[in-house]
Amino acid sequence: MEFPEHSRHLLQCLSEQRHQGFLCDCTVLVGDAHFRAHRAVLASCSMYFHLFYKDQLDKRDIVHLNSDIVTAPAFALLLEFMYEGKLQFKDLPIEDVLAAASYLHMYDIVKVCKKKLKEKATTEADSTKKEEDASSCSDKIECLSDGSSHMAGDLPSDEDDVEEEKINILPGKTDLATESGNMWIRLPSDSASIPQTGGEAETHTAAAGKTADSPCSSTGSLSHRSATSMRDSADVDCVLDLSVKSSLSGAETLNNSYLSSQEILRNSLVQVKVEKEASCDENDIDTTEYDIERNTVKESSSSNIRAPYEPVHLAPIREDSVLRELDHDDKASDDDITPENERVQMETNMDSSLLPYVPNILSPAGQIFMCPLCNKVFPSPHILQIHLSTHFREQEGIRSKPANDVHVPTCSLCGKTFSCMYTLKRHERTHSGEKPFTCTQCGKSFQYSHNLSRHAVVHTREKPHACKWCERRFTQSGDLYRHIRKFHCELVNSLSVKSETLGLPAVRDWTLEDSSQELWK
């Protein structure tokens, strides 16, 4: 005949005895807290206590638990579970209960705590996602409201329209001829120094048009005030003439070229890009490949799209190349704008007269970006770095062997080289099998001194490697590793989950400080 309620009645009686202190044969210390209990109950519910009492049962009246891992409230909760079979977290953190259960090897409690932590993490992730969605919606609404409020402010006035009509007049062939045929170019800055392909140029032009038409765009009509300010900043925007020199005097040519270029600059943009040089001549001739790309702009508002480009002044190049470029551009302005007409490539060599203008080519600070190997000049350090890589790419490959008069420690058997004779001697032991380090206690020999030091612990009976979970000590780090794998694997994994959830240091960083680093190799 079975009595189903017998087990429950037994637990109830044991719980009453524990509260009364009747027949309690052990005391568990967690920090300053004392817990009276029965050894049989503790050993039946916890593998930690089972192993603790297995060896010396009569000498283990007091049990000390690591208060850094097990807290007093968490152990009190687990102790109630042992005697009553009920687990009530109350207001305790689940992480503390998980750490205590892992320390005591109560794996059923560990599984429950892990499940609750996963549910908690999922709930927090869902709530965070909802908050982010709500905030993104509110940001979109604010953006739309700001765009509608700035709509009226972005509309140009009547005077601006008149100025815009004056500025948007494109010069014809006669204008280009009478105005010394000056062309104004802009070199790309560091952030835009990578050459664009044809498809990218089309996309950039289309994007510029959309930006100019959008109500939220920061580009507006070019007023008379902005033109005046551009003339005042002549000391910053250093310019050079790209065209054929006319019969005017030096001062008149400079003034006319500067004024005429201001009008051309508002309507056209020639982007000069420096391509990578693959080789260098023996005579150190300064040569640089340029891709000149000219985009005809219909509206003046798009003249501010490429603000990052700085206007620079280049030395004169060959007459026939410039004339062909001007004629080609004039013909393209009469036809519809197509990708073929928008991109015009011209490859020329820089004249040696560029070198006197080096301080004006580059940044306003006067920095010189010149290749130290071939003396070529570049507009930015980024392009210079790309050019230098072409030199070093040619030198890649097998390292040249040192001169014959330089002695390098080399193994005579396998030909391997070393930095010093000490490492060579250690390497030679792998071929000869020599074991110069001998233990004075047992006569065992080793190839390396650190192996002898590790072996000496066997004779001294020292146990420097301590387990953080059960405070057992071991002579070798490998024994400690096998012990953790066998008895504390669940605890290590659970604390790994805990550290990832709470953003704590990894288990390897704070649980095994006293053990050897070879444990985790």
UniProtKB/Swiss-Prot annotation:
ATP-binding keyword on record: no
Annotated Gene Ontology cellular components are: nucleus
- For region Disordered, the annotated ranges are 190-230
Q: Specify the BTB domain's residue ranges.
A: 24-91
For this UniProt record, the keywords arranged alphabetically read as follows: DNA-binding, Metal-binding, Nucleus, Repeat, Repressor, Transcription, Transcription regulation, Zinc, Zinc-finger
Tell me, in one coarse class, where this protein mainly resides: nucleus
Recall the GO molecular function terms of this protein's record: DNA binding; zinc ion binding
Q: Where are the zinc fingers (C2H2-type)?
A: 369-391, 409-431, 437-459, 465-488
Skewed-composition ranges (Polar residues): 214-230
What highest taxon heads this organism's lineage? Eukaryota
Q: Which Pfam families match?
A: BTB (PF00651), zf-C2H2 (PF00096), zf-C2H2_4 (PF13894)
Keyword Repressor part of the UniProt annotation: yes
Spell out the SMART domains in the cross-references: BTB, ZnF_C2H2
The record's subcellular locations are: Nucleus
Q: Where is the composition biased (Low complexity)?
A: 197-212
Described purpose of this protein according to its UniProt entry: Transcriptional repressor that plays a role in various developmental processes. Specifically binds the consensus DNA sequence 5'-[AC]ACATCTG[GT][AC]-3' which contains the E box core, and acts by recruiting chromatin remodeling multiprotein complexes.
Q: Which family does it belong to?
A: Belongs to the krueppel C2H2-type zinc-finger protein family. ZBTB18 subfamily.
Q: Which PANTHER family match?
A: ZINC FINGER AND BTB DOMAIN-CONTAINING PROTEIN 18, ZINC FINGER PROTEIN
Q: What is this protein called?
A: Zinc finger and BTB domain-containing protein 18
Species per Swiss-Prot/TrEMBL record: Xenopus tropicalis (Western clawed frog)
Task: List the taxonomic lineage.
Answer: Eukaryota, Metazoa, Chordata, Craniata, Vertebrata
Q: Which gene encodes it?
A: zbtb18
